Amino acid sequence: MMMDLSAPLSPHQSLELPHLQPVLWQKVNRLHLCKAISEFSHECLLAPQRMTDHPDSEGYDYYQLVAAAADKPANYVFRARRLALDHWLIDPDSLHKTVNEKSTDLDLLLFIIEFKRQLSISERVLPTYLEEITSTLYSSAFKHCRTGISATALVNASFQIIEKEMMEGHPSFVANNGRIGFDAQDFQRFSPEAASDVHLVWLAAHKSKAHFACIEQLDYAKLMEQELGAEVLAEFEQQLIARDCNPQDYVLMPVHPWQWQNKLTSIFAADIANQRLVFLGQGKDAYQAQQSIRTFFNRSHPQRYYVKMALSILNMGFMRGLSPYYMATTPGINEWLFDLVEGDEILQAYDFKILREVASIGFRNSYYEQAITGDSAY
């Protein structure tokens, strides 16, 4: 098995940031500022004032938005169409900002600060939100820096190439690439847009604290044979025996490499020390991160299942963990819903399908469960 979890990136990958340059930074600020104004106006948090009496031949009007700061009042002017359900379509090239009637650069972070009161962003939350916005701009600059594939080529491209080439992320969420917890090297290793090979970490989880669940058509042995193969399974079994552990007392569990290095080795140290969690190494298969960031596609064996793992980074305002209690019931709920859809004549006439989560493994941390009541990032 692969064991090196900390192989450094090349100097070019780890030290240079070619996407952080003035022209690209201005470009992504303009694009995301248009998105922010559109979404916040749609949500009625902001109310741009119409400046023209009649729309032009394309249905656009000019609007202005004023941030009435006492010392430096800022004025944003742009051309936009108001669509059905009060969605806004802003012409990016038209967006212009003045401060004290002097033209100035567009800056999404400064915009958030200027309108924090209208956006109801508290002083406590504001720094975290600004960090998420900055990370989103960082990711956008990375995407705009690379040489993309044409729309014509994408028509016949594989789904994984399409995943890698996606530019927008969540179409409405403004801070949609927050990823607080990733450093620059993590971004290169684990982000969907970087599309690097990722080798999952495999642990043996003791059944006294772990729970495996699956749909009726699967069982644990069948799933592991399919996903790992007989050779790797035999190797894992030998590792457990060498540690005086009975393989029958454990279930095998994939975890995200970032999660292992940054969370599990410390938060679950007691379980590791007492062999309730046993590190087995990295898997041989190469995976690719999907747009949802914690779901992975198997590049080495595409016929194998996607794998979704907990990833305790702050992304889109939420910690991306997975509750072991939710995991215990997820396959059963998915199976019920799948059968419901399959038995619906109308949905089947439209060839409607659902993607099922067919199996799950959860591991409980008894200390945090005793210490915390209600929802928590832990």
Task: Label each residue range with its predicted role.
Residues 2-378:
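Nucleotide/phosphate-binding site architecture used for ATP/NTP-dependent chemistry
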